[in-house]
Amino acid sequence: MRRSLISVAILGLFTLPVAPTIAVAASTPAKLAQITTQLPRTVKPTHYDVSLVPNAAASSFAGKVRITLEVLTATTSITLNAADLAFSSAQLILNGGKTLPAKIKVNAAEQTATFTFTQPIAKGSYQLALDYTGVIGTQANGLFSMDYDTPTGRKRALYSQFENSDARRMIPSWDEPQYKATFALEVVAPDTDMAVSNMPIASKTVMADGRSLVKFGVSPKMSTYLLFFGMGDFERATASVDGTELGVVTRKGLLPQAAFALEASKVVLREYNDYFGTKYPLPKLDNVAAPGRSQFFGAMENWGAIFTFEARMLLDPSISTQSDKEEVFSIAAHEMAHQWFGDLVTMQWWDDLWLNEGFASWMQARHRPPFHPRGKAFI
């Protein structure tokens, strides 16, 4: 994630130029009672099947998740993270298909939900099936909406922002970086909207009511904070580098302003593939532009679906300067470095987040000079 505050900290190590602070809504600092502790170590997830039905107009969504998990120590309860979610059902699916209903206890202060069963659960593999509803917020944490004006009226787009601990606002999950699992996401969306996630769309089926059921491919193992979902009146342009489909996604009508960002991504991906000796592992890498600004961050490195505020990504060719281009290039280099530092290789806990940011900032600085000499950094 590109943050102005973290950039200040990294400056002392790498003497990088600090991105200017930009203003507008983002997540508010958590109160002390909201700061969570680590989850019990008795269970770990291996796969999430997630189904979402967003209602953008009502700022709410319905969700279902079936979590494949491993019970490591016999237990009578399972605790995971959940925030601002209301559960309607919970059951554990045993081998052979038998189900055990669960008693649900939500701790709002600790942002957890505990599911207790009437009999001990032995070590082994199970599935936890949960039905729930949640809130679409207006600040950049969890699943949130952004409203904007168009010549045909006001529109609303949805995006997600999960770092550091807000995946729990969209999916009940083991929302800690050490818990990596695969994800299969499906979403019911208006047929006129584009849906974007970490993986390419595997199928899109028009339903009887005119909406579309969009299913995305299964992700590689990753931490929950790297999951992404966006939906709106978008358009997309693509290019190919080393077998990877690079994409830029914008609000309809703004795609030409993303041309430089796409070209920058082509240069950076080709260079990183060569430098690291480990090719970018996902089939596609989008950069999704969103309206608005934040004083807390400018972009986020979701694996396969980078999120960037428009002010940090889009350029009007008629008025943009060399400095503007260097800023767009710099942010692309930073967030794409995170696809290796942070996404492919992830810290176990948040106290080592500085490693993600430090390595990404180092690569951002190291690979700017060959392409934009004015942007040299001392490293």
What are these regions (language model features)?
Residues 61-84:
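Ligand-binding face of N-terminal immunoglobulin V-set domains in extracellular IgSF glycoproteins
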Residues 63, 161-165, 172-333, 361-362, ...:
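Hydrophobic helix-coil surface modules that form long, contiguous segments used
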Residues 4, 23-62, 96, 152-157, ...:
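N-terminal, polar/Ser/Thr-rich
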Residues 54-56, 67-73, 134-136, 189-191:
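Beta-strand elements of well-folded, non-transmembrane domains
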Residues 336-351:
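Catalytic Zn2+-binding segment of zinc metalloproteases
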Residues 1-23:
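Gram-negative bacterial Sec-dependent N-terminal signal peptides
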Residues 84-150, 172-175, 209:
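A surface-exposed beta-strand-loop module
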Residues 30-40, 122, 129-184, 232-240:
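Glycine/proline-rich low-complexity spacer/linker segments in large multi-domain proteins
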